[in-house]
């Protein structure tokens, strides 16, 4: 560290120069700037004395400022106070105390290593008492509302039974829907969607808005057609 940083309040110019450096924001009297530069060395440290205000500023004789941690060079300036206050002396003592205290702790607790290795292991009685939890339908993970569900695939047996049920009655009641879902291993929603899709397919294929509910309806329609045909024949004969 240069001597200028040790004592920045004294001139760095040689004696006899006409100009002296100016100090910015200096709270000390102007006679400090007019003093000659001090040649630092082992011989000059005995005759050097700090001004009263400088000593108050650095050694906190009457100043209330906090400690700035300023350390003087012991080679160039006379040491003031106890040598135990030098830089690094306190740290060495603390380091030695820490090492001795750490060794005492290790001697006092020799089983620290063995106990720390068993932290991740669980006690055996906890594993023995733990039983598999019962899963309820509401505990199962459900798909997110914004996520699209996958396409449901039906087996050949399921499609055959559903087709039979559709031919018998294209509309299912709630009771019948529950019976079909339990018989085929499906949910009520899956059975409902299958019947909706099947009805739309039948309408597209036949171009009709209504479904034949039973065979009696078909027979009634045929009877009506047969009755209308002879009536038309009689009207034609009369016109002639």
From Swiss-Prot:
<keyword id="KW-0805">Transcription regulation</keyword>
<feature type="region of interest" description="Disordered">
    <location>
        <begin position="204"/>
        <end position="240"/>
    </location>
</feature>
<feature type="short sequence motif" description="Antp-type hexapeptide">
    <location>
        <begin position="135"/>
        <end position="140"/>
    </location>
</feature>
<dbReference type="InterPro" id="IPR009057">
    <property type="entry name" value="Homeodomain-like_sf"/>
</dbReference>
<dbReference type="GO" id="GO:0000977">
    <property type="term" value="F:RNA polymerase II transcription regulatory region sequence-specific DNA binding"/>
</dbReference>
<dbReference type="InterPro" id="IPR001827">
    <property type="entry name" value="Homeobox_Antennapedia_CS"/>
</dbReference>
<feature type="region of interest" description="Disordered">
    <location>
        <begin position="112"/>
        <end position="136"/>
    </location>
</feature>
<dbReference type="InterPro" id="IPR050948">
    <property type="entry name" value="Antp_homeobox_TF"/>
</dbReference>
<dbReference type="InterPro" id="IPR001356">
    <property type="entry name" value="HD"/>
</dbReference>
<keyword id="KW-0804">Transcription</keyword>
<dbReference type="GO" id="GO:0000981">
    <property type="term" value="F:DNA-binding transcription factor activity, RNA polymerase II-specific"/>
</dbReference>
<keyword id="KW-0371">Homeobox</keyword>
<protein>
    <recommendedName>
        <fullName>Homeobox protein Hox-D8</fullName>
    </recommendedName>
</protein>
<dbReference type="GO" id="GO:0005634">
    <property type="term" value="C:nucleus"/>
</dbReference>
<keyword id="KW-0539">Nucleus</keyword>
<keyword id="KW-0238">DNA-binding</keyword>
<dbReference type="InterPro" id="IPR020479">
    <property type="entry name" value="HD_metazoa"/>
</dbReference>
<feature type="DNA-binding region" description="Homeobox">
    <location>
        <begin position="147"/>
        <end position="206"/>
    </location>
</feature>
<feature type="compositionally biased region" description="Basic and acidic residues">
    <location>
        <begin position="204"/>
        <end position="227"/>
    </location>
</feature>
<keyword id="KW-0217">Developmental protein</keyword>
<comment type="similarity">
    <text>Belongs to the Antp homeobox family.</text>
</comment>
<dbReference type="InterPro" id="IPR017970">
    <property type="entry name" value="Homeobox_CS"/>
</dbReference>
<dbReference type="InterPro" id="IPR000047">
    <property type="entry name" value="HTH_motif"/>
</dbReference>
<dbReference type="Pfam" id="PF00046">
    <property type="entry name" value="Homeodomain"/>
</dbReference>
<comment type="function">
    <text>Sequence-specific transcription factor which is part of a developmental regulatory system that provides cells with specific positional identities on the anterior-posterior axis.</text>
</comment>
